């Protein structure tokens, strides 16, 4: 069954999807994420990694250790490499790490808050550009940034995005919608449209269990399930336009009517790339299927990346998501995954009720918006 969504399609090239699909079948990692640091010059309320005291909980790998892991990743077959944090550009040795990894031939993307894309970093990227920069956008003015991130740097971020585009670097926007910035959603859409930037917007926030093990099922900086659904549908309508929104709403209705709720046991496994064709290495060298499935199982500095990948890949194949989720008629638009189940409930096989509720509200809001559009067209 196709993965029917109401959001605009992602901009990932088809060749990347093909490579990941082939690698998943072969048990080979096509992509890796290196979480270079938990440090950050922002203090975002919804962050699942950084906190003011996070640096006290241990160090981070040296440049030499990250470069060694890069060589091991290349030997494993990794093609796509994402550098993230915290704020990865905050590391003083970032140029050393980045330059060495770039020479290895990886297709490198970088997650950043965008505030440091100037000076030495600008010159580094001018001479040796990454494949893409994923810049987090938290609002459309300095005041929203101050409330949500403790750093009124919106103007600087927009200026730096312009710098990067001027030197020919592809920029994608990541945006997380919270109670602090939900009223900016139309402005965010208009801004990214005016700048000609692709945006990935999400209204679902994972519980920050990596930062606080006691936060299972709870995130103090997220919308209610109903609000998350409302803003999800609102943004979809903004970005798709009425005609495409109506077409997709009709397709969803057909999908629900055809659903027989029969499910094969194989449908309960991990369906995303986590642990199948992708791996995640945290600042200490621990290897996980993804950044949200962070249960320590193997350290790459101690055991080597190849052994850790075999361990993670084998463990991932044993994950079973809830039978209720696999049989649910809303599963094609529900953001529930193995990581979400674990973060929301503490186990892989318990349905995450927050997401169940969000999906039900999403369907309800889609129907209401479609009805409103048709009624207004008929009245007009």
Regions found by a protein language model. Give the residues of each.
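Residue-level signal for the nucleotide or nucleotide-sugar donor/cofactor binding architecture
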Residues: 61, 92, 152, 180-183, ...
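Conserved alpha-helical substructure of the radical SAM core
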Residues: 2-132, 231
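Short histidine/acidic/glycine/proline-rich micro-motifs that form metal-
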Residues: 88, 116, 177-180, 295
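Short loop/turn motifs at secondary-structure junctions
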Residues: 43, 77, 129, 169-170, ...
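Short Fe-S-cluster ligation motifs
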Residues: 69-85, 353-380
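Radical SAM enzyme [4Fe-4S]-AdoMet core and its adjacent flexible, acidic
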Residues: 131, 136-274, 280-284, 292
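Accessory C-terminal segments flanking Radical SAM cores
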Residues: 25, 33, 197, 214-215, ...
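Hydrophobic residues in well-ordered beta-strands that form the structural core
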Residues: 46-48, 110, 173, 201, ...
